[in-house]
Amino acid sequence: STLDRSSAASDVYKRQGKYDSKAFKKSVGLNGVGVKAVNALSSRFEVRSYRDGKVRIATFSKGNLLTDMTQDTEEDNGTYIFFEPDATLFVNYCFKPEFIETMLRNYTYLNTGLAIIYNGHRILSRNGLVDLLNDNMTATGLYPIIHLKGEDIEIAFTHTGQYGEEYYSFVNGQHTTQGGTHQSAFKEHIARTIKEFFNKNMDY
């Protein structure tokens, strides 16, 4: 099948790390299905894997491998992906940069130090979730952002003088726009901790 013939794309892509490595601590989709699907539905698909002075370059058309080569390089370690959707399947398609850039920026917030180049625009976060809050806050915080980071969880929060609440929650690198039990638990325990600290009855 077309997807079977595109296995080289998945092979190149999976060389970026191992499932048990820190590279996959906050990743969504580790089985390569996504990259195979994009490959099969693209008139042109190219993936380059830069590692330790070598680069492996594979190009495809509609899932069919056209070229696969390895050569020396002086580029830094990283991955380059290019794809052009198959116009016979996606008629009059268009990309909405504002949605794509938001998604990519979220990835950099969750993976501190990760640099993503999107159509020539460099997206990078040095301070993770602290940058997320600073970039999205429309009012000055009442106190410096509190940032807690553990092996499997990271939290950053503050309060402003504005009314209302705003949350950015993620699970396995995916923005959970509708919240979830993880967000509900966070809200409940923040309120409970404040209540216990001040020893007052508060509704939450």
Name each model-derived stretch.
Residues 11-18, 78-80, 156-168:
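Active-site-adjacent bridging/hinge elements
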